[in-house]
Design a protein with these regions (language model features):
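A detector for small-residue-rich transmembrane helices and their helix-helix packing motifs
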Residues: 1-167
């Protein structure tokens, strides 16, 4: 799990990655996996496997780092874990991509994603024990990476005119 004294003082930097694979209970794990199953494949199809993995891991590690620094600055000694920062990164990247595609990508639209992100952040703020800094920073990291990594597919119009004398 992510615990800033272990990361900073004991130099256990691997915790920034491994904490994204640790969950605090079956409902925590199932909630994250359901969200990831619903939206993750859309982002993978839009970006490809490698870029998707970059977004997921960078948002996971980045949000863990931001959360650890935030806890250290507030002098809090909380333990953090779960894939939520990485998943919020997927949501952020997907939102940018959907917006770039005029608000629609496959079965998703920008309104759905903004409502999901808004309600999730609201739930986190209203609930105890939620790492809101990881959620928000994961979303921002994902949105930035989505903007950097995504390139819209451009379809060239086929030339339907035939030159005289050709088949």
């Amino acid at each position: 799990a992510s615990f800033w004294p272990a990361i900073i003082e004991e130099h256990e930097y691997y915790r920034l990655l491994t904490c994204t694979f640790i969950h605090f209970g079956i409902s925590h794990l199932l909630n994250n996996m359901l969200v990831l199953a619903y939206i993750g494949d859309n982002l993978e199809r839009a970006l490809g496997k490698i870029k998707y993995l970059i977004v997921y891991l960078a948002a996971g590690v980045g949000s863990s780092a931001v959360s650890a620094v935030w806890s250290m600055m507030k002098d809090e000694y909380s333990v953090s874990g779960g894939a939520s920062g990485a998943i919020f990164g997927v949501v952020g990247a997907l939102l940018v991509i959907v917006i770039r595609n005029r608000g629609q990508l496959e079965d998703l639209n920008s309104r759905q994603l903004m409502l999901f992100a808004g309600f999730s952040i609201y739930h986190g703020v209203m609930s105890a024990g939620i790492d809101n800094m990881a959620h928000i920073s994961g979303f921002v990291i994902g949105a930035l990476l989505g903007g950097l990594l995504y390139r819209r597919k451009r379809y060239r119009k086929q030339n339907t005119k035939r030159a005289a004398g050709t088949w």
